[in-house]
Amino acid sequence: MNDSTRGLLLVSSGIVVLSFDGLLVRLAQADGWSIVFWRGLLMFLALGAFSLSAKSRASLKAQPLISAASALLLAFTSIFFVLAVIHTTVANVVVVDSTAPLFAALFTRFILGESVALHTWLAIGVAALGIMIVFAGAFTATDLAGNGYALLSSAAVGANLTLLRRNPAIE
């Protein structure tokens, strides 16, 4: 399978899984930190099981700080996502979270110094307008906080993507 097909399958799978994520957080009817705890524990167990493979252990030993930074960014992503869903509408969270690749493009440009295509800059501009519209509809402090958490979640995903792009040997 070529990289394009693999990437498309991964993105499509991620969209399907994440489309139910906000609903599941709402259905849990628990406080945010309880949900964060259980999500974190399950993520730790899943990633821990994955890291038992010889290739993953070698990757962890080769660059432990990068691996730890990636894990920390995943934790921030999860925490901010749950807090966002609790504080604002799932629709707002999904719209704002969809900007993660655009954050990755910005971080890649300004941190890694890579060039960004014109159509990506145009997409970033359109997404920024969309985020302004979402934030303009935040009539309460709680909505505004939720939208802010969603933006932080999206930025953490973008930062993690940039980190992994810089260090492709990390599993």
Language model segments and positions:
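Glycine-/small-residue-enriched transmembrane alpha-helix faces in small-molecule transporters
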Residues: 1-36, 72, 80, 139-166
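Cytoplasmic-side transmembrane-helix entry/capping segments in multi-pass membrane proteins
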Residues: 7-11, 62-72, 114-128, 146-150, ...
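Specific transmembrane alpha-helical segments of multi-pass solute transporters/efflux pumps
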Residues: 17, 48, 54-92, 96-97, ...
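Structural signature of transmembrane alpha-helix termini at the membrane-water interface
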Residues: 20-23, 27, 45-56, 79, ...
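Helix-loop interface residues and adjacent transmembrane-helix termini in multi-pass membrane transporters
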Residues: 29-30, 87, 113-115, 169-170
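Specific alpha-helical transmembrane segments that line the substrate/conduction pathway
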Residues: 34-45, 82-113, 153
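Hydrophobic transmembrane alpha-helices of multi-pass small-molecule transport proteins
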Residues: 47, 51, 74, 106, ...
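Helix-helix packing/entry segments at the starts of transmembrane helices
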Residues: 93-99, 164-171
